[in-house]
Amino acid sequence: GDTKGGILRTVFQTAYKSDAGLSAESYGRWTTNSYCLAGDDRHAIAYSMPLILPDGTVYGVVGVELLTDYLQTKLPFTELDEDKAGTYFIVTTTDDALTDDVLSLRKTVTSGEDLVTADAPLGVLNCRSDGNGGNWAELNGKRYYMVLEPLLVYNRNAPFAAEKWFLAGTMEQSVLLAFSSRVREVLLTTIAITLVLSVLGSLLVSARLA
């Protein structure tokens, strides 16, 4: 598990049980849950990898902690919507594909409003396919559109490759529809202005020719 001891134990035991048949980097793992630092109220995720001698002996683990506050600065959720209606998540899942059109995603880092799903435990998002290549989730009693971008954290043959990582961007449906409506209004206004200018231009040309 992703407890302080578990972070170190997981990669050590994985390398040890497989007789360190891969490189140390291949056994490296990021924690899928953030945790509170000892003696601190800040949260972090960690990366750890085993120390392996040339003869294959696993003798220790080395790791580094990364503050979730730092990751949040790299996920400017205001770029999704200037009114701060969007949220970025870094999420993980062990699901291979959409099962019954539902993908269970575990929140690792949140940038924006910390949305809580209504039909899954705290920290889990149930992402559903809309059948048209898009996704949505029910959050805080509202429907949110979700875009998932895979993060290539592990190579295909790594022991922890089953833990898939994604960057998820979410936007409330009503906000997204309002945004689409605004864009549509701007386009219609632009077309109307273009038509008016074209008509005026034609009239001016006709008057000059006359």
Feature locations, PLM:
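Cytoplasm-proximal transmembrane signaling helix
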Residues: 92, 166-210
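Short, intrinsically disordered, charge-balanced linker/junction segments flanking boundaries
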Residues: 1-2, 100, 205-210
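Extracellular/periplasmic juxtamembrane segments that couple receptor/chemosensory ectodomains to their
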Residues: 41-53, 57-60, 111-186
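Short helix-terminating capping/connector loops at secondary-structure junctions
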Residues: 23-25, 83-84, 160-162
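Solvent-exposed, extracytoplasmic
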Residues: 57-108
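Extracytoplasmic/periplasmic ligand-binding sensor regions of membrane-associated signaling proteins
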Residues: 1-63
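Short regulatory "switch" loops immediately downstream of catalytic or recognition motifs
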Residues: 13-19, 52, 92-95, 148-156
